[in-house]
Curated annotation (Swiss-Prot):
The gene is ergo-1. This is Piwi-like protein ergo-1. Its main location: cytoplasm. It is found in: Cytoplasm. Residues 426-534 form the PAZ domain.
Length: 1121
């Protein structure tokens, strides 16, 4: 396998005209049918990658509470229709190697003027440019020689149609002829959805399409909450050009539709401060029978814009407001009379309210037809006319202060208090960049009779004087200024000017910027007369600790509440006296003859039979579909599998198996922000070790009665006082003294319990403080090969003597058993679950792969070190015939790249380990792939499928296992609700039962896909997982095979004694990829502290990093759990 790091050429050059950059993809040395020399070029405009990315056709990004666009997500750069500008073009070059499409996501790393080429990346480019540490443009020793640039005189670029590209010519797996819902398998039921049918006009309506670019203060903007109001304001100012505004539809970003064609095909409005540029695109027919796939995909944006246009119009007073892709309800009453148990507005701290918003995703490719998928979200808004005095009380109390509490407790206290510097700092953070209002009719002050008057919020017609917050000043009775030559305090001024005697003159003044004629001075206003503005505005500023958790708790609807509210919205009923967000009776819907059904779509569903779980001494069958069982808390505790306590040996090994015995050590890690020593709860440690022993895994004890487990070593570490070498010495001592405890026929497995005084993520990244957790994981798991388990000091302190009363003990036991490779359970083979018996047939074994890529957070991309800015691709695969024990391998790759750069090596490792442990080649390879949207399917399926086929043929030309490729995603908005709540459990919040399968109506008509709900819990409404079976060559299996096998895999996650939302291989891939990212940070910290230079342009350094980020090969078990 060779790499090419040159600026453009050689073998496998791929040109991506999105950024006019050359990408070198000589990953697989694959020769196409065109004499082995065809490559391809794809200029589709793939937006910046977001690790929350879902299937939204507007930008290819997903936000759970942030989408109103279609979920078709083809994202092929049709800017001429739904993004503005551009088009779709594909080219290919004559080249010796196949070049795979590479997304060039530029997060501002500035690795050179052409994106920067690195050995971990497919992006080529010229060396140069600023910012990034890693540059490109040169070829490292041992890598492919640079060749001629693709598209040069000797290698001209020829246009080729999209359908001619090999990855677009492949066919997807076909849905089975008979669906499970039509078979006798499982229990049948009917569910409600959050979809409703959409009917287009029977006679097509002619619409004219325009691209729009809105400029605010000379800068182009694409923020919905800004562009929408400005667009309509400009439109009204230019009636001679545009006529009446009600003839236009605007998507609040960049597209406008009109029934009338403008006299000018393009132009610009003449307001210098705010204007927009329009350009005519084309004429379309809206309605009738539309069968063209491309038109159907683009149609969703228009339907969404028409349906929500009325709600998105700026009104005074506002009824709805737009933020990103949700339309938020601005209502005075928190409840709708028809929904007395569903709150539309929740009061939170610091004068904020969490208001509900509605999003609509138009789906045009479903089996039911065109549908509108409604969803809900919440965000923070300022409370109308909320006095700053009350804000100060919220800050002091850390909760919402009610009127009664204010009058009884805070009124007298505030008159005598001095505001602390910390509270002033927090208040300044909250108010920064906020628009406030000053009004003598608002705030808390004393009336003429001396009684405390809490004025109601002023009306919209008398909102007070608005101003921009600058800062906080001295108290009103000590803030002096000169007026007409007389020195006054602010308190004296308001007494003389407005006859207001301040009740709290001791509180700080609020400052605003004074008019220019007053110089650079500030105007000061008493805190008690200042409030938030009357109109609720979205709040995006500083939030108090735990406010996020508080908001989630208060805004989480139960399944029944969410279902009722969505059905109310779909029925187009008013909410708290405000018109529904979508209505067939509004003028825009009538004009375009668009109709939405007023009832949700009902779907058939099947509750699949569960598998049977096998423990060492017992079995469990979830016959009532509860999705939860007892293991550690079972009486007696369920034992690990027979033989699981012995060290796993290779198939060909003749060594006698040794029994594993755990021996613990304690590492106390202090927070660098605290100086106090801390003592850990030794009884908690011993209780955990006792629970591990009771589950069947032997532990080394200090006494015969097994009351006290051996503590091999103990260390207290503080990064401000000790160097990393102290931890290294501690780990070395553990390894060197293991022999003192070993017995015949046994092997000591050391494990370090790291007790953290505070979460490392709280303090890492500030004041040169690093993440202790990441450093420890790198040193222990990877460098020295010692198991670790982290726990917070406060959590260890509450561990009880019995795991029956302590959920934390149960979790710790399951995690430790998984990490050290002691298998606690497996799924029964040969029982009633026939498809699982086929899946785990020893004669035709199955290798299951889970694939995921962990990307850097926004903070890491902006401020992280060079390794923190990279992505980590991980592949996990089972090493046993029961598909229970998994191992992982990871590779570093460029930021935001979703395709696996070095997938061939990952496949080699996973197949190799499977063969080493089972002695058999897999007859079937099943891939569960996460992180893809529908627009990615063709490309990534082709690349990864071909790679697997090639690696198998390289092992042996006769080695041709079946390959199944399944994409897994929860990034969608579809939800299901019980039509009859009595079919659910109160303990599960009346959600659909785990194991519920949906195959029809809201699934696609293009792919073999299905929804499967397997998660359990008692809060919120669970979102089902969407599965796409894109490729499947496994023959001779029943039609119900993949839904039932996938369901069974959700019982196989070793950390939990409940079913989980995703199959175990996918969750393991998530965890392993996350651990790899954390390890990269640990590696960087270790190298920085030890002054070890790492250059990712160096092939040797890159290989070293890839080796260091993987777990020590001598360490057995699923360390990533």
């Amino acid at each position: 396998m060779s790499y090419n790091n040159g600026g453009g050429g050689g073998g496998g050059g791929y040109r991506n005209d999105r950024d006019d950059r050359y990408h070198n993809n000589d990953r697989q040395n694959y020769r196409s049918s065109d004499q082995g020399r065809s490559g391809y070029n794809d200029d589709r405009r793939d937006n910046r990658y977001d690790d929350r990315r879902g299937s939204n056709n507007d930008r290819g990004c997903y936000d759970q509470h942030d989408r109103r666009g279609s979920s078709n997500d083809d994202r092929r750069g049709y800017r001429g229709y739904n993004q503005g500008g551009g088009g779709y073009q594909q080219q290919y070059s004559q080249d010796a190697r196949y070049g795979s499409n590479q997304r060039n996501d530029n997060y501002g790393n500035n690795r050179g003027s052409h994106g920067g080429a690195n050995m971990y990346s497919q992006n080529g480019g010229n060396r140069g440019g600023g910012g990034g540490r890693v540059g490109g443009g040169r070829t490292a020793a041992g890598m492919s020689n640079p060749g001629d640039l693709v598209g040069g005189a000797d290698q001209p670029i020829h246009s080729v149609s999209k359908k001619s590209l090999r990855h677009n010519a492949q066919e997807f797996a076909v849905r089975p002829k008979t669906m499970v819902q039509d078979k006798g398998l499982g229990q049948k039921t009917t569910l409600l959805t959050n979809h409703t049918l959409v009917q287009l006009p029977q006679e097509p309506i002619t619409l004219h399409v325009f691209n729009i670019e809105v400029f605010i203060n000379g800068k182009s903007s694409n923020k919905r909450e800004l562009c929408g109001p400005r667009f309509w304001e400009i439109l009204k100012e230019n009636k001679p050009t545009f006529g009446m505004p009600n003839q236009y539809i605007f998507n609040d970003v960049n597209m406008m539709w009109s029934t009338n064609k403008l006299r000018q095909s393009e132009g610009r409005t003449n307001n210098r401060r705010m204007n927009f540029v329009w350009k005519y695109v084309k004429q379309i027919k809206f309605g009738g029978n539309i069968e063209d796939e491309e038109t159907m995909q683009l149609l969703s944006t228009l339907i969404d814009a028409i349906a929500t246009q009325r709600a998105r119009l700026p009104l005074a007073p506002p009824k709805y407001t737009v933020f990103k892709r949700l339309t938020y309800l601005i209502c005075e009453e928190a409840y709708e009379p028809e929904l007395p148990d569903v709150s539309l507005c929740h009061k939170l701290r610091i004068g904020t309210d969490a208001r509900v918003g509605v999003s609509i995703a138009i789906r045009t490719n479903l089996r039911a037809g065109i549908t509108a998928c409604f969803d809900l979200g919440h965000t923070l808004f300022t409370r109308p006319a909320y006095p700053l005095v009350r804000l100060l009380c919220d800050i002091i109390e850390h909760s919402v202060v009610l009127d009664e509490a204010f009058e009884m407790k805070y009124d007298a206290a505030l008159r005598a208090c001095n505001v602390s510097d910390e509270n002033l700092r927090v208040m300044t953070q909250i108010l920064t960049k906020m628009t406030l209002q000053l009004s003598t009719e608002t705030g808390d002050y004393v009336g003429e009779d001396g009684e405390v008057i809490v004025r109601p919020a002023p009306t919209i017609r008398n909102p007070g004087r608005n101003f921009k917050f600058v800062g906080l000043g001295a108290p009103a009775d000590r803030y002096y200024f000169t007026s007409d030559g007389v020195e006054l305090t602010v308190a004296d001024y308001y007494l003389q000017k407005y006859n207001i005697r301040l009740r709290y003159p001791n509180l700080p003044c609020v400052l605003k910027k004074a008019p220019e004629q007053c110089g650079n001075k500030h105007s000061a206003m008493p805190l008690e007369l200042v409030s938030y503005i009357v109109v609720p505005t979205r709040y995006g500023g500083f939030t108090m600790p735990d406010m996020r958790a508080d908001m989630i708790n208060k805004t989480t609807y139960t399944a029944q509440q969410r279902g009722k509210l969505l059905q109310h919205i779909i029925a187009q009923k008013s909410l708290s006296g405000i018109e529904p967000p979508v209505s067939n009776n509004d003028d825009y819907m009538k004009k375009h003859k668009l109709v939405m059904k007023r009832e949700p779509i009902r779907v058939k569903a099947t509750i699949l039979p569960p598998p049977t779980l096998v423990y060492g001494d017992s079995v469990f069958h979830d016959e009532h579909h509860i999705g939860e069982w007892e293991a550690v808390t079972h009486d007696p505790p369920r034992q690990v599998l027979d033989g699981a306590v012995f060290r796993r040996k290779l198939y060909k090994s003749s060594e006698q198996p040794l029994m594993k015995r755990l021996m613990g050590s304690i590492l106390l890690i202090q927070s660098p922000r605290q100086c106090r020593d801390f003592d850990y709860n030794q009884q908690g440690y011993h209780a955990i070790m006792r629970a591990i022993e009771d589950s069947g895994q032997p532990v080394l004890w200090a006494d015969e009665n097994k009351h006290s487990a051996v503590i091999q070593g103990e260390l207290q570490f503080n990064q401000n006082q000790h160097g990393i070498e102290v931890i290294e010495q501690f780990l070395q001592n553990i390894k060197s003294t293991i022999g003192e405890y070993e017995r015949d026929g046994e092997v000591i497995v050391p494990i370090v319990f790291a007790v953290f005084q505070a979460r490392a993520t709280v303090y890492s990244g500030n004041n040169n403080e690093y993440n202790d957790y990441n450093v420890l994981k790198y040193l222990a798991d990877n460098k020295y090969g010692i198991h670790t388990q982290g726990i917070l000091e406060k959590s260890l302190g509450v561990v009880g003597p019995s795991p029956k009363n302590c959920a934390l003990t149960r979790l710790m036991v399951e995690k430790v058993l998984g990490k050290v490779g002691t298998t606690h359970r497996k799924l029964e083979r040969g029982g009633a679950h026939k498809t699982w018996t086929i899946f785990t047939d020893p004669a035709k074994p199955t290798l299951v792969l889970g694939i995921d890529v962990s990307h850097p957070s926004t903070r890491d991309r902006e401020t992280g070190n060079v390794l923190q800015k990279m992505s980590a691709a991980t592949v996990v695969g089972n090493i046993d015939l029961d598909v229970t024990e998994f191992r992982a391998s990871s590779r570093i790759q460029d930021t935001g790249v979703e395709c696996l750069i070095d997938f061939s090596k990952e496949i080699d490792e996973r197949i190799g380990e499977f063969i080493d442990h089972t002695g058999k080649r897999p007859a079937h390879i099943v891939v569960y792939r996460d992180g893809l949207s529908e627009g990615d399917f063709q490309k990534y399926l082709f690349e990864e499928r071909v790679c697997i086929e090639e690696r198998c043929l390289k092992i042996d030309t006769s080695f041709q296992p079946s390959i199944t490729y399944i994409v897994v995603t929860k990034r969608h908005h579809t939800q299901f609700f019980l039509e009859d709540p009595s079919q659910g459990y109160e303990s599960q919040g009346y959600n659909v039962l785990p194991g519920t399968l949906i195959e029809d109506a809201v699934t696609t008509n293009k792919y073999y896909d299905f929804f499967l709900s397997t998660q359990i819990g008692n809060e919120g409404c669970f979102r089902p997982t969407h599965y796409y079976v894109l490729h499947d060559t496994w023959t001779g299996k029943p039609d119900s095979f993949w839904p039932t096998v996938t369901h069974a895999l959700t019982y196989n996650f070793c950390r939990s004694t409940t079913t989980v939302a995703l199959p175990a291989p996918v969750l393991y891939a998530h965890l392993a990829a996350k651990r790899a990212k954390e390890t990269l940070d640990g590696i960087n910290t270790y190298k920085s502290v030890n002054n070890i230079y790492c250059d990712l342009e160096s092939f040797g350094d890159l290989c070293e990093v890839n080796k260091d980020m993987n777990v020590n090969e001598k360490l057995e078990g699923m360390t990533f759990v």
